[in-house]
A protein has these predicted regions:
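Extended, charge-rich alpha-helical interface modules
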Residues: 1-129
Length: 129
């Protein structure tokens, strides 16, 4: 299989690494974990080679990972609501929480990109609420 090499923002790279770390904690299937660990190793290696780490970047990474961990739980809870055909107040709250957390996630990724001088920046624009 051919490799596809694509430049990404530092925020996107850290976001992906944080998600892979959460997957390593949550997923139990050994075959899936093998792929997850391999991808994590590749991305972490590139991060260490290309990005100068500091305490502020580590703090932002930890915030990003915390948000992604919350999103993981919320998505599991939403799937349980789907299974139970329960689309009441709990489902609505969970759905709203997703977009609030994703807004926070986008802000942190932009802050990471600004801090690291990333040439690529994920720009978002949403309807105000």
């Amino acid at each position: 299989m051919n490799k596809i090499l694509v430049e990404v923002s530092v925020g996107e790279l850290l976001d992906k690494i944080s998600i892979l770390e959460i997957k390593q904690d949550k997923i139990k299937d050994v075959n899936k974990l093998e792929f997850i660990k391999s991808e994590h190793s590749i991305l972490k290696d590139q991060l260490e080679k290309k990005v100068q780490s500091n305490s502020q970047l580590e703090k932002l990474f930890n915030s990003l990972k915390e948000i992604n961990a919350k999103l993981w739980v919320i998505e599991d809870d939403k799937r349980q609501c789907e299974k139970d055909k329960d689309f009441g107040e709990k489902f609505i709250k969970l759905s709203r929480d997703v977009h609030f957390l994703n807004d926070d996630r986008a802000k942190i990724k932009l802050e990471i990109n600004n801090l690291t001088g990333s040439k690529i920046k994920e720009i978002k624009e949403y309807t105000s609420y």
